[in-house]
Amino acid sequence: MFRNINPLGKFACILLVSLNTVSCVTETVDSPNAMKFSNAAVIAVQDPNIFVSKGSTFAWLPEAVHFYNDKRLENAPVKALIEKEITKNLLAKEVILVESVNGARFAIAYTAALESSLDDTAILRRFGLSPGNSQVPKDDSNIEKGSLIIYVFENKTNDIVWRSAAQAGVAFDMPMDERKVRIERVLAEMFQTFTVTE
């Protein structure tokens, strides 16, 4: 097509295509009622063939919970906050939490770690997910990338029904009230990807 057009015509075509491409702009507008999320990167996968419905029974699977302790966070009850928010978000989905995994249709567990204990390569290899948050500063010793992976299993088959991974910068000197709000936001964002049917 361009062989028969003179150089000025080619330039005009390229200019029109370029202007048309540049004029397509995406703008994000904050709604005053929208939930403000953390600066976490979140990714999730849910099996479309296994349906979780309201009223389904869930239980913790303690042997699949992996919380990597770090001395720099020893005064912050991060594990308790994560578990509280997982429970809160599950109940908001109108499922039923039971004490024993033997009496539940689904089991839930999680892994939480800083990058020094569990890096992106290990997360991808173990969980098949890679949120890939690269916005964490590398030159600040007060911040390290943290990862949280939540997984739901179907008890009878041991199939993974849903898994979600989030990554964000973890500031070691963050005040407790800010840390609590941040964990709440990250968990809310993760659970938005978990579909529960009527």
Where are these regions (language model features)?
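Sec-dependent bacterial lipoprotein signal peptides
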Residues: M1-C24
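Flexible, glycine- and charge-enriched loops at secondary-structure boundaries
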Residues: K10, N75-A80, M176, K180
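A structural "domain/chain start" motif
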Residues: S23-L81
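C-terminal/domain-edge helix-coil "capping" segments
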Residues: V25-N49, D139-S147, K156-E198
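N-terminal segment of the mature soluble domain
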Residues: T57-E115
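Extracytoplasmic/secreted cell-surface and envelope-processing proteins
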Residues: N69-D70, S117-D119, F172-M174
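Surface-exposed short loop/turn segments
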Residues: N102, F106-D159, Q167
